[in-house]
Regions:
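Membrane-interface motif at the C-terminal end of an N-terminal transmembrane signal
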Residues: 1-17
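Activation targets extended, charge/polar-rich intrinsically disordered C-terminal tails
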Residues: 2-5, 133-205
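Non-catalytic ligand/cofactor/substrate-binding and regulatory segments of enzyme domains
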Residues: 12-13, 17-26, 30, 37-158
């Protein structure tokens, strides 16, 4: 939802800016970045349409963070070489949803980079729908949690997307950005730094 070995997380908020844009966040590990300090508390003023049924499970959240990963690897209690190797093969995916009520600094600390991208409400909605279709839903209904997440305010959900060595958490994040119409190249993306590099380029324009 980490970087290097951890992966890119998507942080969504439907809070409308005066200019009529919404905010989208990509998070990765690395040195502190000024973007973190600019991202103060956000007010979740309305549900994201694509994931409205899911967002309703996290009342009071300012931001929802999403991360994709290999189910067996994510749920493993200990780091085992067999589980790590298994993650390179096509395997069931898992999505971690984390509700953030504090500032991004309090939630992620200085070791994470936060890149702020201004997108239109329509683009944010498309990204939300991409996430919804990545969940293992039945007849479009709100999926039940697969299990509790690693921290307070987080839940795991089964994914309809399969994870493998050529489709990682970072590939998924890049595809989500692309679903919102952002010029992000998802094909061939495997590592977090690739997504973060493109996100920084977009943020600088």
């Amino acid at each position: 939802m980490g970087i290097g070995v951890v992966g890119v997380k998507l942080l969504l908020s439907p809070h409308a800016l005066p200019a009529g844009h919404s905010l989208f966040f990509a998070v990765g590990a690395g040195p502190p970045h000024d973007g973190v300090r600019k991202a103060k508390r956000l007010n979740l003023s309305r549900d994201l349409r694509g994931i409205a049924a899911l967002a309703a499970r996290f009342p009071g959240a300012a931001v929802l963070a999403f991360g994709f990963g290999d189910r067996a690897f994510v749920l493993a209690r200990h780091e085992e070489i067999g589980v790590a190797i298994g993650a390179l093969l096509p395997s069931p995916g898992l999505i971690l949803v984390t509700a953030l009520k504090d500032s991004l600094e309090a939630a992620y600390g200085a070791r994470y980079v936060v890149v702020l991208l201004h997108v239109s409400p329509a683009a944010l909605d498309s990204i939300a729908w991409f996430i919804w279709y990545s969940l293992a839903t039945k007849c479009g209904r709100r999926p039940p949690p697969y299990g509790p997440g690693p921290c307070s305010g987080s839940l795991f959900y089964a994914s309809s997307v399969r994870y493998d060595g050529f489709y990682t958490c970072n590939t998924w994040a890049a595809e989500a950005l692309g679903a919102g119409g952002l010029p992000i190249q998802a094909a061939g993306v495997l590592f977090a730094f690739e997504v973060m590099r493109e996100a920084r380029t977009l943020a600088s324009h």
